[in-house]
Design a protein with these regions (language model features):
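Bacterial Sec-dependent N-terminal signal peptides
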Residues: 1-27
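Active-site nucleophile elbow and catalytic-triad environment of alpha/beta-hydrolase enzymes
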Residues: 62, 203-218, 223-224
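Short beta-strand element of the alpha/beta-hydrolase
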Residues: 75-84
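Active-site glycine-rich loops that stabilize anionic/oxyanionic intermediates
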Residues: 83-88, 232
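Catalytic nucleophile-loop/oxyanion-hole region of alpha/beta-hydrolase
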Residues: 90-100, 111-147, 270-274
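Primarily recognizes the serine-hydrolase "nucleophile elbow" in alpha/beta-hydrolase
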Residues: 131-196, 210-211, 215
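Short beta-strand/loop motif that positions the catalytic acidic residue
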Residues: 222, 227-230, 234
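C-terminal catalytic histidine-bearing segment of alpha/beta-hydrolase fold enzymes
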Residues: 239, 243-277
């Protein structure tokens, strides 16, 4: 367990200090499901780019984008990466591909999970995340990955998905560790990111379902070691989300670390590292 959190810390702080990002090219892209999954998200039409940052919306066809580790530096570690976007779109270009490419250059296989948007079908993202972990395990020998060193990383709403996987995994989809950047954790009205709640739960936004998806309430002693990173002045996802998850991990004697940067707001690396300058 200590090795897992040590690996997570090294990954994150090496990444935060690496400017500009350089890494490996995309190795392959594979369908997440060999046959269409049972539950459909009800979205029709092609994927679209939305907003000034070009997030990917209307995602109904999930894939894994695999950036294999530099062979000369391969550590045997792999990370499944869940970009954020409020469960309504995916920040693939900000919180997916660049990070995976950089990890691969450091000897860590980066696997970007392009998961389906739930559109109120709340089970869909977690099922995609579990399947992503299973596929990495299935290809472990081919991709030269140690099955005991497969972790999950998530940003914002992708952090909520990663935290849900960390607390609701099955034997075939258990992460060795978690790395959560400014994650949505709680669906409690006092702390929740409302857009994420609405997009994930839709009309099923009952108090029972909000409790079910409040991941600070789902931690057990079997939750994998987890590292959390965020900015103190995040105005999009309240810092209390990460603090509650950290406290729950400590109460359950799960190895954990929490880093709160003094500034940076809500967003990826370029903002988080401002305090270093």
């Amino acid at each position: 367990m200590k090795n897992s959190i040590r690996t997570a810390v090294i990954i994150c702080f090496a990444f935060l200090g690496a400017l500009p990002l350089r890494g490996q090219e995309l190795s392959l892209e594979i369908p997440l499901w060999a046959t269409p999954p049972t539950e459909n998200n009800g979205l029709t039409g092609p994927e679209t780019k939305v907003g000034s940052k070009g997030f990917t919306a209307n995602v109904s066809y999930p894939v894994l984008k695999v950036y294999r580790a530099d062979a000369a530096r391969n550590t045997g570690t792999a990370v499944l990466i869940a970009p954020g976007g409020g469960y309504g779109a995916l920040a693939m270009r900000q919180e997916g591909d660049p990070f995976a490419a950089w990890l691969a250059g450091q000897g860590i296989t980066g696997v970007v999970l392009k998961y389906r948007m739930p559109n109120g079908h709340h089970r869909i993202p977690l099922e995609d995340a579990k399947q992503g972990m299973r596929l990495i395990r299935e290809h472990a020998r081919e991709w030269q990955i140690d099955t005991a060193r497969i972790g999950v990383m998530g940003f914002s709403a992708g952090g909520h998905l990663a935290a849900t996987l960390l607390t609701r995994y099955e034997a075939t989809s258990r992460p060795a560790f978690g790395i959560l950047f400014y994650p949505v954790i709680s669906f409690d009205d006092r702390w929740a990111h409302r857009g994420s709640v609405q997009n994930l739960l839709g009309a099923d936004s009952t108090e029972t379902m909000k409790t079910y998806y409040s991941n600070e309430l789902q931690v057990t002693p079997q939750t994998p070691p987890t590292l959390l990173l965020l900015s103190n002045n995040d105005g999009t996802v309240k810092p209390r989300n990460s603090i509650m998850f950290y406290e729950a991990l400590r109460e359950n004697r799960v190895l954990t670390a929490l880093y709160i940067f003094p500034s940076g707001g809500h967003g990826c690396k370029s903002r988080l590292i401002r305090f270093i300058d």
